[in-house]
């Protein structure tokens, strides 16, 4: 297990410092599996761990890299104590539906944090040449340079879902000469700026720092989502969302997309006191968390409790009832 110091991620956007907990700390150490360290989940997890660790001493939280698709199974089987994921993956993991091969019924929701949007960055020059949708990417007769993001993440899963729906695969696209990279958001941001890639995808909240940086170094725009792809994503648990105009250079108007709701999961074996204290401490330090990511500025107990039909952890139920977020 690789644990990352929360403060490193908060300060630098991505974390490289690695600490291995000693045996004496193992009982007290709890891990949060995030997404890529510089992405939305990474920053949310790092901020949460940081304020929690500073305001109590019974449990210490650390963050570890993961992915929205992989984290439910990882948490369920003890690979991490908590994990960020998305509502569609949490539901399908509990039920044992694709992309999961078996059910993970011990998963419990702690809190919903945000609604993410599927960001499809593309070089403006490539967009103007006629590659404006996923359909254009799949049917292209010339090799393309595409960043598909780390395998196991919700972003990579979304891309694979679309490609298969269009009758292709990453392997078929690679066979025509495509350059494909499966790297994190920070690396993809740098690569699209320098022209090493022309397409970069990311399920994230707004604003997203990697996307902002990418647009500062190259003229970028967003691919269009066809009605065909919107129907596909709707059938797989995604909901309509809007990427606000004015956040990313060169994109003054709102962009219609599809997205997922990001949430924190644990299992039914997790201490109710730990879950309760995480939520209570987080809300008590919401101004501090708001400086880590703007998502926290809009994060309320009512929003956190809105996990749909997913089962809430008893510690979360206790907190949400106490503050009047649920009955």
Predicted regions and their residues:
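Bacterial N-terminal signal peptides that target proteins for export
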Residues: 1-9
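C-terminal segment of classical bacterial N-terminal signal peptides
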Residues: 14-24
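Extracytoplasmic
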Residues: 27, 56-58, 67-70, 77, ...
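Bilobed "Venus flytrap"/periplasmic-binding protein-like clamshell domains
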Residues: 29-55, 59-62, 116-190, 194, ...
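Pocket-flanking alpha-helical
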Residues: 44-50, 62-103, 186-192, 204-215, ...
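A structural signal for short loop-to-beta-strand junctions that line the ligand-binding cleft
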Residues: 101-119, 247-256
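An extracytoplasmic/periplasmic, membrane-proximal ligand-sensing/linker region
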Residues: 194, 199, 204-207, 211-217, ...
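C-terminal lobe and pocket-closing loops
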Residues: 221-277, 312, 319, 323
């Amino acid at each position: 297990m690789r644990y990352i110091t929360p403060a490193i991620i908060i300060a630098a956007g991505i974390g490289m410092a690695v600490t291995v907990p000693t045996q004496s700390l193992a009982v007290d150490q709890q891990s949060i599996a995030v997404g890529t360290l510089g992405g939305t989940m990474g920053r949310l997890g790092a901020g949460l761990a940081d304020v929690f660790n500073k305001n109590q001493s019974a449990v210490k939280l650390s963050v570890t890299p993961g992915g929205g698709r992989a984290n439910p199974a990882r948490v369920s089987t003890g690979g991490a104590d908590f994990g960020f994921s998305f509502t569609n993956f949490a539901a399908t993991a509990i039920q044992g539906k694709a992309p999961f091969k078996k059910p993970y019924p011990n998963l419990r929701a702690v809190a919903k944090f945000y609604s993410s949007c599927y960001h499809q960055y593309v070089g403006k020059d490539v967009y103007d040449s006629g590659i404006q949708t996923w359909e254009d990417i799949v049917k292209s007769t010339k090799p393309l340079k595409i960043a598909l993001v780390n395998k196991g993440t919700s972003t990579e899963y979304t891309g694979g879902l679309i490609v298969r729906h269009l009758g292709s695969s990453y392997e078929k696209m690679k066979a025509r000469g495509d350059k494909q990279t499966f790297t994190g958001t920070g690396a993809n941001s740098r690569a699209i700026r320098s022209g090493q890639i022309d397409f970069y995808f990311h399920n994230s909240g707004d604003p997203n720092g990697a996307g902002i940086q990418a647009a500062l170094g190259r003229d970028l725009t967003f691919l269009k989502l066809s009605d065909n792809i919107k129907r596909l994503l709707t059938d797989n648990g995604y909901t309509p969302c809007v990427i606000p105009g004015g956040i990313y250079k060169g994109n003054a108007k709102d962009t219609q997309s599809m997205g997922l709701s990001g949430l924190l999961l644990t299992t039914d074996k997790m201490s109710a006191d730990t879950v309760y204290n995480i939520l209570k401490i987080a809300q008590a330090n919401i101004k501090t968390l708001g400086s880590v990511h703007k998502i926290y500025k809009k994060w309320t107990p009512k929003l956190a409790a809105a996990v749909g039909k997913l089962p809430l952890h008893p510690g979360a139920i206790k907190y949400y009832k106490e503050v009047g977020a649920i009955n």
